[in-house]
C-alpha cells in the first residue's frame, strides 16, 4: 500500500493549548481540529495562524446548535476549512437544509451501523466510515461502496486503538478521499512494530502481523 499523508488531531482543550499544539505540529500536511468549546472562533483563527499551510478539517462531534453553526461558518471560510464534520446533533440534521454552510459536510454520528444512506440529510456530502462502527473491514468497504453509489465522498476514521486496528483502516483509506488514522498515537504503549509516521506520511511497518 502507498503511504498516505498524515493528519494530526488537535484535541479540544483551552485555546492556548490548542494553538500551541498546532504550532508544534505546523509541518503536518493536515490538521483535524476538534471544536465545540468555549471560544471556537479564537481557537480556529489561532490554529490557522500557527499552521498557515496545513489543510484544516474541523470536527465538532455534535457540539454546536444551529445558531452557533451559522455564526462560525464565516470564520471557517476565512480559515479555509476544507471539511466540517458533524456540526449539529444528529437529531437536528433536518435543520441543516436551512443553513447555507458552503463547506463540505461530513456525517459521523449521523452515519451509524445499518443506517440508510438515502435517509441522510442531503446537506451531507461525505460520510465517516470507521471499521469499529461498521463491524470490520469487509462491512466498511461495503459502506464505502454504497456511499460512492450515492455520490458521497468518504472519510475513513478510527477510534483510539493500536496499530493492529489502524492497519486495516489504512488499507481502506487507500480508496478514500479523507482519512483520520492517528488513534494509535493516543496510547501510552502500542504494538511493536507500530504504524510509521515519517516526513508527513503514515505507512505500514514490515511485519505488523507477525
Write out the residue ranges for each language-model feature.
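C-terminal EAL-domain catalytic cores of bacterial cyclic di-GMP phosphodiesterases
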Residues: 141-142, 146-158
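Glycine-enriched alpha-helix->loop->beta-strand junction motifs that scaffold or abut catalytic
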Residues: 26-29, 50-54, 74-82, 99-105, ...
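Histidine-acidic metal/acid-base catalytic patches
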Residues: 138, 149, 189
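Catalytic beta/alpha-barrel core
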Residues: 9-11, 29-38, 55-63, 79-92, ...
Amino acid at each position: 500500500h502507498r503511504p498516505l499523508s498524515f493528519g494530526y488531531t488537535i484535541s479540544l482543550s483551552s485555546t492556548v493549548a490548542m494553538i500551541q499544539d498546532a504550532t508544534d505540529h505546523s509541518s503536518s500536511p493536515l490538521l483535524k481540529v476538534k471544536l465545540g468549546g468555549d471560544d471556537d472562533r479564537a481557537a480556529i483563527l489561532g490554529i490557522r495562524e500557527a499552521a498557515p499551510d496545513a489543510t484544516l478539517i474541523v470536527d465538532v462531534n455534535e457540539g454546536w446548535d444551529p445558531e452557533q453553526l451559522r455564526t462560525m461558518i464565516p470564520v471557517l471560510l476565512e480559515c479555509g476549512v476544507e471539511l466540517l464534520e458533524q456540526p449539529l446533533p444528529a437529531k437536528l440534521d433536518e435543520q441543516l437544509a436551512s443553513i447555507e454552510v458552503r463547506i463540505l459536510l461530513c456525517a459521523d454520528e449521523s452515519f451509524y451501523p445499518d443506517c440508510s444512506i438515502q435517509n441522510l440529510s442531503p446537506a451531507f456530502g461525505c460520510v465517516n466510515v470507521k471499521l469499529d462502527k461498521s463491524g470490520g473491514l469487509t462491512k466498511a468497504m461495503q459502506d464505502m461502496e454504497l456511499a460512492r453509489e450515492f455520490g458521497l465522498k468518504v472519510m475513513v476514521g478510527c477510534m483510539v486503538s493500536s496499530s493492529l486496528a489502524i492497519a486495516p483502516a489504512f488499507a481502506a483509506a487507500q480508496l478514500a478521499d479523507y482519512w483520520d488514522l492517528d488513534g494509535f498515537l493516543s496510547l501510552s504503549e502500542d504494538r511493536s512494530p507500530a504504524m510509521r509516521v515519517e516526513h508527513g506520511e503514515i505507512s505500514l511497518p514490515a511485519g505488523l502481523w507477525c
